[in-house]
Amino acid sequence: MSLFFKSIKSKIEETLNHTPQVNLFNNSNNGGNNSNNGGNNSTPTLTKTPSTTNFPYNDYKNYTYKYVYDNTDNYNFNNNNNNNNNNNNNNNNNTKENNFKSIRESASIYKNNEEINNDDNNTIINKKKIEEEEDETNFDTSLIPKLGHEDKDELESDHYITIWGNGIRNYKNCNMSSIGFSEMYNQQKIVLISTGAIHSSFITDQGNLYTFGDGLLGKLGHGNLESYSSPKLVEFFQTKPSLRVVSIANGGKHSLALTICGKVYSWGGNDSCQLGLGNGSSSSYYSLPQLINFNISYNNNNNNNNNNSTNNNNNNNNDGAQQQFSLSQNSSSNNNKIKIVKLSCGTNRSAVITDKGLLFTFGRGDHGRLGLGEQSLLMQSTPKLVQSLQGHFIIDMSSGGGHSLVLTNKGLVFSFGRNDQGQLGIGCFSNQQTIPKQIQWFQTSQQQQQQPINIIKVSAGGYHSIAISDNNDTYAWGRSDYGVLGTSIDVQGDRNLPVLINSNSVVVDNVKFIDVSSGFQHNVAMSIDGSLYSWGCNAGQRLGFKSDENQLTPKKCFINSKDSKPLLFTCGEIITIIVEKRFKEPIIKTELQLPSSTQSQQQTELSLPSSVNSSSDSNFNKSIIDNSSTTTIIKQTNNNIKSTTTTIITRPSSPTPSFLSLANEGKDLLNSTQSNFIEWMTLISKSKGLLNLIQMKATSSLPNLGLSIEKKNKDFDDINRQLKLLVNSNLSLSPLPDNIQSEIDRLVLSRNQLGLGLVSEYQTSIDYWLEIKQQKDLTFLNLSKLLNLSTITTTTTSNTTTTTTATTTTTTTTTTNLINKKVLVHQDEKQQQREKSETELEEEQDEEEEDSEIKNGTLTAIEIQQQSFYLVERLNQGLGNFCNNIMDSTTMVQPLTTATASSTTATATATTTTANTTNSSGIINKNFGESLRLSMEEIQLIVLETQKYAIKYHSLLSQQLQQCDDLINIHRGKLVEVQDFLNKSKLAQSLLEQREKLKSDYRFCKRNSIELSKKIEVIELDYDQNLCDDDDNNHENNSVNNNSNNNNNNNNNNNNNNNNNNNNNNNIDNNINSNSINDSSNNNNNNNNIEKLKNELIKLKKDEQKLLSNQQEINELIIEILDKYVPEFKIKLRANDKISSRIKDTGLLVTDRKFQHYDIIKTLSTHPHNVYLANFNDQLVVLKEFGIGDAFGKQIFERQVSLLKQMNHKCIMPIQAVFYDRNAFMQMEYISGGNLLDWCRNNNNDNENNKRRQPWEIQKIFQQIIQAIAYMHSNCIIHRDLKLENVLIRQDGTPVISDFDLSKDISANVNVTVFNINGGTELYKAPEMKEQNVKGSYSTDIWAFGVMLYKCIFQFVNNNNNGNNGKNNNSDGNENDNNNNNNFLIIREPFLLPEENNLPLPANHSDQRLISLLSSIFQRNPKLRPTAHQIAVHPYFVTSLVEDLLSSRTLIDCREKIAAFRAHISSLSEMAEEMSESLQLTVRREHLVLDFFQFFFKKIESNKLFCRLEVSFQGEKGLDLGGLSSEMYSLLFSDNQIIDNSNNSNNSVSYSIPKNSLFSKKFNLFENSGTESPFYLLNSNDLFNNNNNNNEENNNNNNNNNNNNNNNNNNNNNNNNNNNNNNNNNEENPLLILKNEFTIFKILGKIFLKSIIDGKPIPDCFPTSFFKYLLGVKVNLRDLEIYDPQLAQSFKKVLVLDNIEEYLSTTFEGLIEGGESIPVTDLNKEEFIQRNIERVLVGCRQSKLEAFKSGFMSIDSLNAHFALFSPTELQLLMCGNTLVDSSVLQKNFKFIGFPDTSSTPKDFRRAVDEMNQDEIRLFLRFVTGMVALPLSGFEKSISIIQVPLSQKLPCAHTCSYQLDLPDYNDFDTTKKKLIKMLEYVDGFAFI
């Protein structure tokens, strides 16, 4: 009998774990994924999975079952995993074999599936090769990860996955925030986790890889592009034991995995080659893992002993010498192969770390993301070693948004990639860092620590970085938005250096962190006590807090408690995922006792963050039966009731006797009852499935916006009604009052915002209901399948009563048969009916009423769901009682054997015992049978009720699905309606623009038609006149007729020419007129022309009609749209119609511009118009407002816009845009240089504030002004208000005429004036305007121009009015200034007295051309005044005033000469710039001189030397704003050594000349006399015979000197010999490719001239003889002494010696013809010395000097200036200020970003003041690239920009004259850093 009850128990377990053959949630084989038109979400299913092994026959108390989440499609009661676990427990020795067997079985299924899939992206490439190369025995078990942050807990626990953040919405149907991973997957534990942008991966302790989340681009590795809401096993890695995954890394679009045998696989997006598959990979993504081929191995060149020694050394110090590796296809030993131990992924890049600490990267490489240098800035398709990190042992790496952090075993941190937000922590903000750079701050921190900071953990976020030190301090740097740096609100701004965050955030708790993970804009860290802290952006509650407010400092978000503790955590882009360990509830243990009543036990909730819903919030019922060794605990949790009931069923304390008959027949009963019992238990399991389906509620990650949509929709309609009413009621008002216009604007803005909000919410609502409908569809389908399968018991659903009766009969019969076959005592059913109590009858009545309610459809879905919870509780309790009854029977079988054995020993005793046993067992058997039958009937009643409710719920679901469809269609219709409404607004705007375009085209066409009609009429009249003339002159001779015809033709030509002048805009008319002119001599041709013109006129008429028709169509469409959708456009249309066509035709009108779009800075003027200085789109502009309330103001605005549009001249104020906003507005250029009056009063040179403008500056300005006036007059426009205040000056010195309020178009004959009838300012009015009320003419503008020039010359220019032409001015000019002021006092204002016809002018003025010009202008009779064109060609403007002053020697002062020269060059450069000419020069640093010479040789003519030179260095990025060209000149002219020869007469320092300098010996262009002289002259040797020729003349000269002074001669010979030897040993001259010595030195002269034109000084390293030769001045002994002091000293001794014949026996050989016969005597020794001086300094290099001079003097206009310079002045012009004045330099300093409290600017100035000349020159070169101060001053200021505090040296940007200076705030530190900076000038790169 014991066997029978054990069999019953086994069948119950087998039935409960039986899987019905039905797919509940999908009919397709797509991996469990469902999709429809409503979305891409998949629904998680309920799977009933045993959490222990197979049912233990010897101990039923260990059996439990649980409802858990699973993503499979079947309603599983599968126990295969439990069988495996049981087998593993029973046979530990075969564990590995069984696992491999299971893996191979699953692999065969997987491979079969792969054969069906034909998608190239979903197949395993090189599968055969992988199988052949895989080594299944070479497992590296050290790679297997351990449980993260796991401690030794004695209590059992489960792993749960908690998700924070809105990124979870991207996961399909993920409506839970916590996933019971261990319950879902057979008690597996998670050991490693990685999260990408919106997908995640987990590795378990069994080596399985699970992924879930967004599946786009196949980044989940499942062979498809589907997304999954819960972890799904990656089956690819189950195919082989060697594919066990030990490490995983997720990126933005892809994933990497490392297997136990060291192989790396990648899958997902491959748009940037981030999968590392090589260039042969053509696909943009792979949905299955692909093997990365590492064809790299270590070199083993040493023997084994050496290798062992090396290994030992490496073990002691892993950061030793760099590893040797080589590329190899086949390695002889596996020990040499690369072994990967660490993976890292970024957005589009990947990285791996080897066991030798090497780093390989691949993928996207821009901005240095891969750290491979500038050579790999694109994409790297295969792993490549980061060479610069060799020698460091890399142990960790973190990849952020665009940057990466690398950690070594010594705690050093390196960073590379993007650095625009300071995320690299290297102390600057730069665009990129292409190679890894160490963060030095940790080694030289400001934190006063005794030792450097060692880092143990790094994490890179989107634009920020986090690091943890070995003492658990946390540092952050990079972008500081959203509080992501955790430094509180007190520390603002991006940080380019690490900042300690613990002290600012958690100082009260004194929390230290041991681990950290960074997302795009948030961070999560684990403290030492195991709690989690988060900070940064909390959008979507990704930090675990309810509020969406950002967290500026670390705040505790997850507590390590006794119920749960966090183990692993990771931050994705916008989500946070935590793996937590939840401890199981302690087992309740009780002593053996009799059954007791049900006790209530309150369930303890897990400690979770307040913002995260616990797993108890799941939308399904969870039933758990826990079993101890002595007690069965049945739990039923109801989420709606939020309570837990626990029933404790305790075994009896002592055995109970069993029945003999039951034992005898148990064996036969086992076989006969098996089939019926399985059917009954299957029915129960299906009922449980039905109840679970009923309890499932459709949920969505999207909000239900029903109420919000309804409210917004109502508001939207109300606003439209209000807008229509407001517009229609005020449409007649013109203009609209401000309050009404403001209200209309407000309503329009509100309507548009509501419309956009409705579009978004309708779309969200549609997605919401589609998601709900999808879930309800699945539930409906699954209910249909289960109900169809249950027809074995129920026949139809139409007749509920009949079905119930039939089912009851069938089930009762089955139950009765079961009990009868068990030989149990049953009572008759009628007897049972009679024994029913009244209570039971009442219950039946209630059931009948309930059946009636179900049948009549009065129950709702919610009520049915509530009943299902009650039924589940009853069913669980019934099953528990049933199991209890069966299990108790096993205790009754035990005494049976004992009683039988004892009866054989004594018959009498046995008889008595048997009788007693029978009687006793009879009673017990009866009670047992009754209890068993009742429990079975109770279960069957529950099953029937379940079917009733399921049928009704199925019907309700059908109705709900129809309602969902209706609601979705309604919302879709509303969405289309709102979108159409918004689109109509855009359509109306487009139609208005088309309407205006058609109107403009119509006007143009109409004008052409009228003009063409007039032309046809004129031609016809001319033709008729010609015919009449022919008739009248029939009897005249042909010559007379011909003359008459010619005259007529001439008249025709004149008429046609006039028509041409009036119709320049019509190309067709011009062609017609041209044809008419050419053919007017022929009457036949005239007829043809008339026909052509008439045809053209007909075509124009047709075009007019077509344009009118199109206008009418658009007008009708506009009216329809405006009335229904956008009534506010009616006002806009009316206002647009009122705008003059003159404004519209300019193309300047901006219809959507408003005054509020401008940021008004200040008001510049209020009369006669409001003029504002405003900021628009980060640009300063001037906004001029015109009142257009009346026709007068409107006409003023339209005329001014029309006039300015006609003129396009650089000296006339341009209009940028016009718009209407109640008034009319004109946007113009903002000119910051002030007006002409201020310009004349102030001088640009701060050192000469007492001096006025120079005459040539005035001449240049007024020359441009008169050209602009001539341009205006040529367009028939007069200004009528010219004055100094109305002429503005740009920064480049260009004058701009403005304020055209009084301007007039004479051709239009418009007599509109403003404010006074004549207009203009009184002082500038012409006499006729004052006396005759003339309203203005061309001559009035000429008079005003003369007044401006008169005031500038006589009031603001330092002229010699007293006729003192030849007098030298003092340097300070005070005497002349006083004389000029006295002369100015007697000069009156420029107006005419009544008796005067012209203005008296000073007769003794130095510039008579100026007096002549002014005399011609200041004439009373307007007709006598010159025109603007005549003034422009007046001698005063034609002849350069600079040249005139030079020729008259008026410019005596050196600075005046140089200033005049610079002014002349400036004017010529501006002319070249106007022609848009520039010189583009790209040079190589290593071949700078050669590139420069070739550039001049091929492209540079003398007339192009004034063009702007734009320099770029090959392979370097940079924009030449002056700095790059300065650097190029500095490198060209002995860049590495600045030589100061200003006070140098005897310098004995030897200088090292760089190879790329003009002075390098390899070019052989210059030479010096020896080490005592630093000066250079052109080389006297032949460039092409340098290696073979020695200078015999020098040797002779040395021999001559020998006779005079042996010691000196010996020294000279030695020096000369050394020089010759050096010359002979020089490498080949690169310049010899030019093949012409004269060309080389001519180009050299042009280079020097170009440097002067560009204002780039050269070093002062040339003697005075060089400049004297250029100017034609004779050299002397002093010049030789500068160049060759030793030789000059010898000559001096010769001069002082008497009787020279006695000491020096030499002749004039080589100096003059026949000199060998002329001895040197006291009489001719001076001539001898002078000739030697000329030979040494000039003669031996005469040809080179001539070639140089031909290039240097190649521009004739500059030679006149050079002729006026002295050699010293020319030297000053070329070399600049050799003595750098620090005070002059400091006037150009501009400090930016330093706070007022900082002392660094003051300390910096002081440090510069204390520099010596050498240091200050180095400073000048470091910042600007120049070696001397230009005499013309700096082109722009030197910007000194504050950067965050650090110990780094200042950094210079020569392109922009910028110096990045840390805010040291200490003088000693500032000075020390500056001096240190100058020591390493050559080590700094010029940016």
UniProtKB/Swiss-Prot annotation:
| HECT domain mapped to chain residues | 1501-1887
Biased composition, class Basic and acidic residues, residue ranges? 825-839
Annotated catalysed reactions? L-seryl-[protein] + ATP = O-phospho-L-seryl-[protein] + ADP + H(+); L-threonyl-[protein] + ATP = O-phospho-L-threonyl-[protein] + ADP + H(+); S-ubiquitinyl-[E2 ubiquitin-conjugating enzyme]-L-cysteine + [acceptor protein]-L-lysine = [E2 ubiquitin-conjugating enzyme]-L-cysteine + N(6)-ubiquitinyl-[acceptor protein]-L-lysine
Could you tell me what this protein is called?
Answer: Bifunctional serine/threonine-protein kinase/NEDD4-like E3 ubiquitin-protein ligase
Compositionally skewed regions (Acidic residues) per UniProt: 840-852
Output the SUPFAM superfamilies linked to this UniProt entry. Hect, E3 ligase catalytic domain, Protein kinase-like (PK-like), RCC1/BLIP-II
The record's EC number reads 2.7.11.1, 2.3.2.26
Alphabetical GO biological process terms? protein ubiquitination
Q: Which residues form the Protein kinase domain?
A: 1158-1437
| Residues the entry annotates as binding ATP | L1164, S1165, T1166, H1167, P1168, H1169, N1170, V1171, Y1172, K1184
Q: Where is the active site?
A: D1281 (proton acceptor), C1855 (glycyl thioester intermediate)
Tell me the lineage of the source organism.
Eukaryota, Amoebozoa, Evosea, Eumycetozoa, Dictyostelia
Q: Where is this region: Disordered?
A: 19-55, 72-98, 299-333, 594-619, 823-858, 1030-1088, 1586-1628
Instruction: Write out the pathway annotation from the protein's UniProt entry.
Output: Protein modification; protein ubiquitination
Compositionally biased tracts (Low complexity): 26-54, 72-97, 1036-1088
